[in-house]
């Protein structure tokens, strides 16, 4: 669900409305990169029985370095929480006319209720709720394409990598931040560790025997899980951009979620616009646990401090409500929150590639040379993109 949060919606919708099909290639590339990265994260948790923050916490010996690393990881997790609350507030405003600040508070209360379901009723009850929300999200964001299909020539042309000024680079960074999501890298390694954890604490060397299932079999199943999840998420994210490119390009005011909603309502009817708003609301609620879970795991792994998920959620509501209360444009805040995520990706990705390449840590399951090369290329590309973005911003380009 991390790949279908309001940050994805804002980034893809704005990119399609402003640049048409220009950044289709970024969505596709981001999805391919996310597949590799999330599989490596899951593999690390399965093979070692530890999360990425745990492994880094044991390997970063200087306390100030460990705290600095924790701070940047905590900021990207908090940026995700901010996006969820703002997206839910905008959706409630579009659907029911609720003021943004009150909508943010309502979204926060509902997200806390969902976390209670997860903690008290177990993962299965929470997964049932999330699957239902996923169906709503997919329907809400793909319905418009049936009423106004995209231009096939434009879609194919959008697969050619290129930019058009600083704003397109900013949106590309936002799309990649929303797609790859560094906090999801931390969280997925922990989720895979917990999902396949044996009943009793076990040393890494004895995990396979304690589980009673071969590690290669678990890794094959994980590859399928990641493939299916990202195929669904990638399709929906691409649908959002194509919907905007086909219907909103050149229309005044459609570089905001509110403007996009109004244009969809005027051009395709109230049903499509309502489905869009419902999908936006569902995306904020469905991804509510990811940022809180990732932040808790980051703090425990790096600082060895445990904070209850609900307490974390209450704390992270503050910056989101402050943004809404100050009247900052919510779409701009959403897009910039995803840019923050893009700057956090290398800090999660580079250690992930290094650790999953080590024979002493993963043994026979370490990365193949081609996999490591792909991870290095992804890291270099993301660092270069962020460097170009900074240069354009500070040079006035």
Mark where each language-model region is.
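Extracellular/periplasmic helix-exit of transmembrane alpha-helices
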Residues: 35-47, 192-207, 211, 231-259
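Helix-loop-helix module between adjacent transmembrane segments
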Residues: 33-42, 64-84, 92-118, 177-178, ...
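Hydrophobic alpha-helical segments and their helix-loop junctions in multi-pass secondary transporters
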Residues: 134-160, 169-190, 352-360, 385-396
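Membrane-interface loop-to-helix entry segments
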Residues: 106-107, 118-144, 163, 340-341, ...
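Flexible loop linkers connecting adjacent transmembrane helices
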Residues: 11-16, 39-65, 117-122, 251-265, ...
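Transmembrane alpha-helical segments of multi-pass small-molecule transport proteins
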Residues: 68-74, 95-117, 135-140, 306-322, ...
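Loop-to-transmembrane helix boundary motifs in multi-pass membrane proteins
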Residues: 63-66, 101-104, 228, 271-273, ...
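Extracellular loop-to-transmembrane helix junctions
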Residues: 14-39, 53-58, 102-103
């Amino acid at each position: 669900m991390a790949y279908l949060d309001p940050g994805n919606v804002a980034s893809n919708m704005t990119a399609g409305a402003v640049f048409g099909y220009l950044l289709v290639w970024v969505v596709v590339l981001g999805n391919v990169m996310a597949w590799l990265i999330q599989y490596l994260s899951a593999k690390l948790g399965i093979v070692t029985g530890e999360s990425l923050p745990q492994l880094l916490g044991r390997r970063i010996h200087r306390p100030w370095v460990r705290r600095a690393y924790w701070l940047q990881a905590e900021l990207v997790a908090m940026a995700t929480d901010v996006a969820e609350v703002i997206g839910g507030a905008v959706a409630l405003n579009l659907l029911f006319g609720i003021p943004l600040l009150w909508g943010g508070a309502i979204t926060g209360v509902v997200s806390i209720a969902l976390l209670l379901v997860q903690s008290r009723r177990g993962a299965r009850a929470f997964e049932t709720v999330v699957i239902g929300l996923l169906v709503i999200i997919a329907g809400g964001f793909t319905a418009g394409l049936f009423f106004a299909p995209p231009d096939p020539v434009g879609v194919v042309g959008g697969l050619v990598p290129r930019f058009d000024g600083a704003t397109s680079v900013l949106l590309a960074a936002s799309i990649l931040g929303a797609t790859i999501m560094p906090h999801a890298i931390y969280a997925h390694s922990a989720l895979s560790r917990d999902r396949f954890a044996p009943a009793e604490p076990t040393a890494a060397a004895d995990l396979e025997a304690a589980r009673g299932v071969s590690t290669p079999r678990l890794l094959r199943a994980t590859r399928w899980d990641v493939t299916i999840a990202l195929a669904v998420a990638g399709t929906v994210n691409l649908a959002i951009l194509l919907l905007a490119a086909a219907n909103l390009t050149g229309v005044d005011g459609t570089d905001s979620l509110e403007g996009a909603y109004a244009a969809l309502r005027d051009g395709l009817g109230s049903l499509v616009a309502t489905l869009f708003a419902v999908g936006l609301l569902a995306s904020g609620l469905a991804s509510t646990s990811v940022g809180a879970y990732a932040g808790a795991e980051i703090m425990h792994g790096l600082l060895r401090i445990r904070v209850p998920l609900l307490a974390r959620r209450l704390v992270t509501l503050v910056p989101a409500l402050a943004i809404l209360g100050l009247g900052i444009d919510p779409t701009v805040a959403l897009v910039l929150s995803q840019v923050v995520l893009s700057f956090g990706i290398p800090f999660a990705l580079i250690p992930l590639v290094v650790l999953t390449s080590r024979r002493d840590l993963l043994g026979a399951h370490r990365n193949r040379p081609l996999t490591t090369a792909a991870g290095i290329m992804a890291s270099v590309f993301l660092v270069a993109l962020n460097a170009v973005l900074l240069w354009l911003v500070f040079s006035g380009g």
